[in-house]
Each structure stands twice: as structure tokens, then as C-alpha cells.
Amino acid sequence: MALEFTDANFQQVVMESDKLSVIDFWAEWCGPCRAIGPVIEELATQYEGKVNIGKVNVDVNPNLSMNFGITSIPAILFVKGGQVVDKQIGAVPKAVLDKKIQAHL
């Protein structure tokens, strides 16, 4: 199951982690966000224990969105060692995200 990243836990769970983190910035009112939601859940199950995969609701956690300059959603950031190493804007097939994850493991 995908994690829920928030303003409160993001620093510890993502930025201070040695693992790759995949963060899906989304909102309930966003159609493409809802479309990619099941893909994020599948990847979270597939990479459980190896990669931190989770979601940030931009309406509930606006500080994270501002800090990362998120202006379009869904936006998926790949963070490793406290740095953004890749990103994907818009809904894409699972294979695209899987390839990006593999590239940064």
C-alpha cells in the first residue's frame, strides 16, 4: 500500500531515507490523478521494502507542493539521498514509472 507523505513526516520518511522515494503529488478533484492512483498502489506493492512509494495530497499539504515547485498534477518526483533525481508530469503507463524506478535503484 502506498504511504501517505505529509508536511509533518516528509523530512524523516523521504529526505533522510537511504531508499529511493517515489512521490505522487495529487488532488481528489484531479481526473488524471485518480487514473494513476491504482498504478501507484501497484508499484508500492511491487517494491515494498525496497522503495518508499507514496502520495502527497496537494490540497492538504501545500507547503510540500510549494517547496518542490509543483504547478501541474499529477506530478511524480523521484528522490534519493535528499535530492530529486527524476520527475514525471502527467499520468503515464506503469511501465514508464517502473523503468524510472529501476534506473535509480
Task: Give names to the regions the model predicted.
Residues 55:
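Conserved residues in the N-terminal Rossmann fold of short-chain dehydrogenase/reductase
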Residues 1-52, 60-105:
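Proteins that catalyze or organize thiol-disulfide redox chemistry
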